[in-house]
Amino acid sequence: MAAEEGKDEAGLDQVEEEFSIWKRNTPFLYDLMISHPLEWPSLTLHWVPSTPIPYSKDPYFAVHKLILGTHTSGGAQDFLMVADVVIPTPDAEPGLGGRDQEPIVPKVEIKQKIRVDGEVNRARCMPQKPTLVGAKTSGSEVFLFDYARLSGKPQTSECDPDLRLMGHEQEGYGLAWSSFKEGYLLSGSQDQRICLWDVSATATDKVLNPMHVYEGHQSIIEDVAWHMKNENIFGSAGDDCQLVIWDLRTNQMQHQVKVHEREINYLSFNPFNEWVLATASSDSTVALFDLRKLTAPLHVLSKHEGEVFQVEWDPNHETVLASSGEDRRLMVWDINRVGDEQLEIELDAEDGPPELLFSHGGHKAKISDFAWNKDEPWVISSVAEDNSLQVWQMAESIYREDDEDEDDDDEGNQNAQHSNENQK
């Protein structure tokens, strides 16, 4: 027992030491770094997909919105939360003050709290109506809230969603809105089911049943995701190590492949390339796949220590993606760099493979969720079990060279495409 306590203390000391080193290096590693302590940890995080508005005190800053939740473990009432994030625009000049000549500091402010039953496992906004939020909690229902409708109204102690979406028997985390079909919401849970609702359909007493239930997984479904180019295709993944591709036109599986030896926790379709997707697994890797050949990965990204819980493609750069795991690290990868030579062999090998662009070490506990900001390239928000919410952007010097290379590649690809078309 004493040995275990000593081991725990040593682990905590190591976390504090690593955090201290990270903090000292922050000015050199980041162009933007906001760290905001939350009253309760949030398991979920999502940028509201609406146009940022100019900040009233300084036109060189803009207000972005974030959706968060609370994870109180029964210690208090739980809420879905809307936050304002004030960050500089790309045109902002360093040290620029507001109208009162006081320097404007990037910040996060919780603006709205909406009562929910149970902890918020995951919350996501409808792309076509950004104020409409789907929320999966520690119960089996999925709640739908229009936070604009509730804005300005007194906060109640009752959970009063616009809709209660039924169909699951257990809680879960998988939740995804279709960017093509307005109102289509997918959910995957521990009951091994995937439910699909059309929230624009007529509900009875604010209760809506699924338009279809998909079954085929043999264990907990960890995640669901829509294809980014084909409105009829979606994917699911779970603890049975299976990646499943489904087609709405037949409501059948297109592919079912065991792609990892341990649980698959997340999947993400590339927003630019219709064939490429990524999976995050408890085997400590992120794997990249071609939909035309799922039997073997295109490439495996390895640097995390422990389970990898999330992977998300950058909405602004085709070859860039990020992943997070139980090692408290959020890693940004650029697959354009796969195979690059490493000059300082020993030093570079310690830093990781050449495709590892950046490793964010600002959290002291497991990262629960993170999100790319589509309106501000290279800006990421992340939340962790240590109650921290961080909004950050790596230093331009880290990615600039890669941006230039990507522009050259894009031009080359376009020329090649024109050449192919001419040959046809």
From Swiss-Prot:
The gene is MSI3. It comes from Arabidopsis thaliana. Keywords: Acetylation, Chromatin regulator, Nucleus, Repeat, Repressor, Transcription, Transcription regulation, WD repeat. The modification N-acetylmethionine is found at M1. Belongs to the WD repeat RBAP46/RBAP48/MSI1 family. It is found in: Nucleus. InterPro entries: G-protein_beta_WD-40_rep (IPR020472), Histone-bd_RBBP4-like_N (IPR022052), WD40/YVTN_repeat-like_dom_sf (IPR015943), WD40_repeat_CS (IPR019775), WD40_repeat_dom_sf (IPR036322), WD40_rpt (IPR001680), WD_repeat_RBAP46/RBAP48/MSI1 (IPR050459). Residues 394-424 are annotated as: Disordered. The DWD box is required for interaction with DDB1A. Its main location: nucleus. GO terms for cellular component: Cul4-RING E3 ubiquitin ligase complex; ISWI-type complex. Core histone-binding subunit that may target chromatin assembly factors, chromatin remodeling factors and histone deacetylases to their histone substrates in a manner that is regulated by nucleosomal DNA. This is WD-40 repeat-containing protein MSI3. A motif (DWD box) lies at residues 233-249. It comes from the Eukaryota. WD repeats lie at residues 167-207, 216-256, 259-299, 303-343, 362-402. The keyword Transmembrane helix does not apply. It holds the Pfam family WD40. One of its GO terms (biological process) is chromatin organization. Residues 413-424 have a biased composition (Polar residues). Transmembrane segments: none annotated. Residues 401-412 have a biased composition (Acidic residues).
